[in-house]
């Protein structure tokens, strides 16, 4: 069997070989016992090439084993280079679909190793990555516990760049847990830390994106739109895939402030045309349904673009609210001509299941959206006329108020006379 040494010629040979042969050659290069500066440099190249090859073949488990195998090599190179290689391999595993659990395992192993080796700088960054993965995996309690400890440690060391990342993660985590005050507080902390240093455009875009999400959650869609626009510009300039999500949320804000007619114009703009695809098609379908006040079109959009609408938690929160509003408007319009009507007839007119319509009408009555009652025995909705306020009540209140003023005035005058 041919043995390959850590030389430039071997790297060139690996680059020319097919994937399987290249992987074998590169593994042998890493096993070369030589620790000369040249051999170390060649091994670093071999690690990069091997990562690329294993990622292409979607061999995530082999990447995890590679990271374990490289631990003795890490003692020969500077800590900064070790950190770069470790993060590079974790990033390589992340490129392989369906490896979230593997990434979590890998990060936990690396946290243990970095703790044993007292590599604080690398450990903190791997822990931040682990917290993000746990949040993605909906393991919120574990992620929050990890972040709570990490943020205190990083704040003490005053590593502001990492602190921005951690505060942003904490904001996203609290938002996922529906704790808006804490999400806003963490975002404010991230902005404060970011103001003291130079923040890379990608990180600034992430801050703007999170700001837009929180403003939209508070129904401040105009401010949310501004932040989403800033995030879109940052991500678009970098070619970051998050640009399409920023644009999608911009369109969502337009729909929520009843400016659905602007959606088509934004999509057909020079910037929008770059991102034409299912996400923008979904928002266009929702905008069309909203413009036409059509529940049928709205439901068709939710069905046809389930992945883009219902599976996106940000969009889903707002569209469920929009759907309720649209449903209420349609029901009010349909029952307006009647004083008594069968619920089945309303359900037929609106094209929704009977029990769904009955439940919604009951909720609207309780919320005082209209005056009425449900006769469930007869399966009817009885609508009452809006009670007209008797003018005598307002006149009586006005008279009492005037009498109060007179009494107060008399009291003041008598007090002056007595003094």
Curated annotation (Swiss-Prot):
Protein name: 26S proteasome non-ATPase regulatory subunit 11 homolog
Function according to Swiss-Prot or TrEMBL: Component of the lid subcomplex of the 26S proteasome, a multiprotein complex involved in the ATP-dependent degradation of ubiquitinated proteins. In the complex, RPN6A is required for proteasome assembly.
Keywords attached to this entry: Isopeptide bond, Proteasome, Ubl conjugation
InterPro entries on file: 26S_Proteasome/COP9_Components, PCI_dom, Rpn6_C_helix, Rpn6_N, TPR-like_helical_dom_sf, WH_DNA-bd_sf
Top-level taxon of the source organism: Eukaryota
Lineage: Eukaryota, Viridiplantae, Streptophyta, Embryophyta, Tracheophyta
Expressed in which tissues: Ubiquitous with highest expression in flowers.
Family statement drawn from the similarity comment of this UniProt entry: Belongs to the proteasome subunit S9 family.
Assembly description: Component of the 19S regulatory particle (RP/PA700) lid subcomplex of the 26S proteasome. The 26S proteasome is composed of a core protease (CP), known as the 20S proteasome, capped at one or both ends by the 19S regulatory particle (RP/PA700). The RP/PA700 complex is composed of at least 17 different subunits in two subcomplexes, the base and the lid, which form the portions proximal and distal to the 20S proteolytic core, respectively. Interacts with CSN1.
Domain PCI as annotated: residue spans: 217-388
Organism: Arabidopsis thaliana (Mouse-ear cress)
GO biological process: protein catabolic process
Cross-link named Glycyl lysine isopeptide (Lys-Gly) (interchain with G-Cter in ubiquitin), sites: 160
């Amino acid at each position: 069997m041919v043995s390959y040494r850590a030389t430039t010629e071997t790297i060139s040979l690996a680059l020319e070989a097919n994937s399987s042969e290249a992987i074998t050659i590169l593994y042998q290069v890493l096993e070369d016992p030589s620790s000369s500066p040249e051999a170390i440099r060649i091994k670093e190249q071999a690690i990069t090439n091997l990562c690329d090859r294993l990622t292409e073949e979607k061999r995530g488990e082999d990447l995890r084993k590679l990271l374990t195998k490289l631990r003795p090599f890490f003692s020969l190179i500077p800590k900064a280079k070790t950190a770069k290689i470790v993060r590079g391999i974790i990033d390589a595993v992340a490129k392989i679909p369906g490896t979230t659990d593997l990434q979590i395992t890998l990060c936990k192993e690396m946290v243990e190793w970095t703790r044993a080796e007292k590599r604080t700088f690398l450990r903190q960054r791997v822990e931040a990555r682990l917290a993000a993965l746990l949040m993605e995996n909906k393991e919120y309690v574990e992620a929050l516990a990890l972040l709570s400890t990490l943020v205190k440690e990083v704040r003490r060391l005053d590593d502001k760049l990492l602190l921005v990342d951690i505060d942003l993660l904490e904001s996203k985590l609290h938002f996922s847990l529906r704790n808006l005050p804490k999400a806003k507080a963490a975002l404010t902390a991230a902005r404060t830390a970011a103001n003291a240093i130079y923040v890379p455009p990608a990180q600034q875009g992430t801050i703007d994106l999170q700001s837009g999400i929180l403003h939209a959650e508070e129904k401040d869609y105009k401010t949310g739109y501004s932040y989403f626009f800033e995030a879109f510009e940052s991500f678009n300039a970098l070619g970051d895939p998050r640009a399409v999500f920023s644009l999608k949320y911009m369109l969502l804000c337009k729909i929520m402030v009843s400016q659905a007619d602007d959606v088509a114009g934004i999509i057909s703009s020079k910037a929008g045309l770059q991102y034409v695809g299912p996400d923008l098609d979904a928002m266009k379908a929702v905008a069309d349904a909203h413009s036409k006040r059509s529940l049928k079109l709205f439901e068709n959009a939710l069905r046809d673009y389930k992945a883009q609408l219902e599976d996106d938690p940000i969009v889903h929160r707002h569209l469920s609210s929009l759907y309720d509003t649209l449903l209420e408007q349609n029901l009010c319009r349909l029952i307006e001509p009647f004083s008594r009507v069968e619920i089945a007839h309303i359900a037929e007119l609106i094209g929704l299941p009977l029990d769904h319509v009955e439940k919604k009408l009951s909720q609207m009555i309780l919320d005082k959206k209209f005056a009425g009652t449900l006769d469930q025995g007869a399966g009817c909705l009885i609508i009452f006329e809006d009670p007209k306020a008797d003018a005598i009540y307002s006149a009586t209140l006005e008279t009492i108020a005037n009498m109060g003023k007179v009494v107060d005035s008399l009291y003041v005058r008598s007090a002056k006379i007595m003094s």
